[in-house]
């Protein structure tokens, strides 16, 4: 019987304390507000909700525009807290909540793939993930860092419902999915393909004596319910986009470049987000391919990895066409 400390799972409470110890001081220094690209954009949206909760029309930019063109939930949480803490502190509190949710969601998501000890290590490593640091302190992407953990928390319920028809799992999974969509729709759109499909595949593998067709049908049912719910929750957004479709020229962005041709872009969009995980990539591909239960996850990771390389390969341009034009 193994008694080594490292052979036991790391308590989730300890991981949350580590997260708080690392990101708490950095957020207290207001680094996202002073150094990132988009943090103050989200504060600006929240400011409008704080002063005009039921009027989405914001006259302060572009001779006026509707804030329904961006999912509102993160901004509305900031607006609510701002009545007590002020806008800037409220942004930092919501961002802290998002950062604390990340290791929790990684643990819950990892548990459907691996045993408790491995899941706890995945959760701990997520605290130090370069992608999290980049999104929070450089990009200022509060909605992405809040929507992603909400969606990861929904996926284990999707697995439980698809595999065993657990009604409580259906309700919890749909609720978390709607919350994730109300924070950031694009994260949900990509996540539904790159994460939900591998989870459904795993539910089929783990079905036991159940019918594979029944598992797929239940997965489709939950996806359908969530889809209708997202349509309702984001109805103002869909109306705004249909009424005023995006017709501007694509804005050049370094993430869509060939990363191999520019060391700065390669560092910013590959080495920083992946960090030391770059060293583990060969093992990830080998082990993910060798273990049957991990193959769906490995395939989802591989597709995500290719898209994350931007214009380094022609695949993103072939799939998304104008959306990834440089």
Language model regions located:
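Membrane-interface alpha helices of multi-pass inner-membrane proteins
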Residues: 169-185, 228-232
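Active-site lumenal/periplasmic loops and adjacent helix-entry segments of GT-C-fold
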Residues: 9-14, 21-152, 156-157, 179-186
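Hydrophobic alpha-helical membrane-interfacial segments at the cytosolic entry of transmembrane helices
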Residues: 18, 210-237, 297-303
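Membrane-helix boundary/interfacial segments in multi-pass membrane proteins
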Residues: 62, 71, 133-146, 247-269, ...
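Membrane-interface transmembrane helices that cradle and orient dolichyl/undecaprenyl
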Residues: 152-172, 180, 205
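Membrane-interfacial loop-to-transmembrane alpha-helix junctions, especially the N-terminal start
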Residues: 11-14, 118-121, 169-172, 218-223, ...
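Hydrophobic, aromatic-rich transmembrane alpha-helices
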Residues: 229-232, 274-307
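Perimembrane helix-loop-helix junctions
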Residues: 2-3, 190-227, 253-259
């Amino acid at each position: 019987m193994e008694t080594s400390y490292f052979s036991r799972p790391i308590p989730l409470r300890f991981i949350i304390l580590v997260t708080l110890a690392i990101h708490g001081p950095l957020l207290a220094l207001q680094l996202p507000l002073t150094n990132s690209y988009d943090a103050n954009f989200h504060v600006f949206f929240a400011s409008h909700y704080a002063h005009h909760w039921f009027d989405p029309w914001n006259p302060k930019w572009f001779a006026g525009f509707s804030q329904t063109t961006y999912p509102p939930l993160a901004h509305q949480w900031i607006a609510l807290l701002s009545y007590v803490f002020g806008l800037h502190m409220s942004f930092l509190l919501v961002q802290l909540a998002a950062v604390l949710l990340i290791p929790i969601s990684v643990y819950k998501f990892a548990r459907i793939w691996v045993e408790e000890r491995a899941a706890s290590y995945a959760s701990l490593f997520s605290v130090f993930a370069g992608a999290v640091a980049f999104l929070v302190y450089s990009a200022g992407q509060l909605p992405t860092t809040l929507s992603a953990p909400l969606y990861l928390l929904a996926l284990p319920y999707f697995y439980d419902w698809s595999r065993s028809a657990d009604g409580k799992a259906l309700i919890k999974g749909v609720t978390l999915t709607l919350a994730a969509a109300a924070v950031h729709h694009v994260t949900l759109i990509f996540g539904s393909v790159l994460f939900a499909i591998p989870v459904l595949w795993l539910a089929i593998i783990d079905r036991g004596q159940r019918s594979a067709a029944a598992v797929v049908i239940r997965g489709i049912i939950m996806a359908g319910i969530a889809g209708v719910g997202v349509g309702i929750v984001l109805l103002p957004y869909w109306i705004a986009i249909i009424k005023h479709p995006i017709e501007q020229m694509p804005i050049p962005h370094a993430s869509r470049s060939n990363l191999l041709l520019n060391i700065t872009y390669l560092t910013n969009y590959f080495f920083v987000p992946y960090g030391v995980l770059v060293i583990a990539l060969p093992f990830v591909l080998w082990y993910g391919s060798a273990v049957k239960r991990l193959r769906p996850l490995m395939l989802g990771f591989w597709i995500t990895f290719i898209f994350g390389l931007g214009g380094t390969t022609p695949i993103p341009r072939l799939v998304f066409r104008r959306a990834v034009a440089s």
